[in-house]
Swiss-Prot record:
GO terms for MF: acylphosphatase activity
PROSITE patterns referenced in this protein's UniProt entry, alphabetically: ACYLPHOSPHATASE_3
Active site: residue positions: R18, N36
Keyword Lipid metabolism attributed: no
Lineage per the UniProt record: Bacteria, Pseudomonadati, Pseudomonadota, Gammaproteobacteria, Lysobacterales
Name this polypeptide is given: Acylphosphatase
Disulfide bonding pattern of the chain: none
Domain of life of the organism encoding this protein: Bacteria
Record key words, sorted: Hydrolase
UniProt xrefs under NCBIfam families: PRK14446.1
Record has Repressor as a keyword: no
EC numbers for this chain: 3.6.1.7
Similarity field: Belongs to the acylphosphatase family.
InterPro entries associated with the record: Acylphosphatase, Acylphosphatase-like_dom, Acylphosphatase-like_dom_sf
Amino acid sequence: MQAARFVVSGVVQGVWYRASTRERAVALGLVGHARNQTDGSVEVVAAGSAAALGALEAWLWQGPPAATVEAVTRTPCAVPPTEDFVTG
């Protein structure tokens, strides 16, 4: 299992970005979280197969219809201690 931390910036808060990310992550079999950050970005930490992480990263660039994604950064991280994907 691999894990990655993504930081998504742009118009990504107040547009159902976290909930949509959770739906996509669960469909891909990933665990982790999506959280709003004080700077207006969304942090996504996800763990699963390399292919699923790649598919999530590609989706993060699109997001839900109301979002405008300007940047997605990816860094490796520790596997999150959860068996689900949550928003918070």
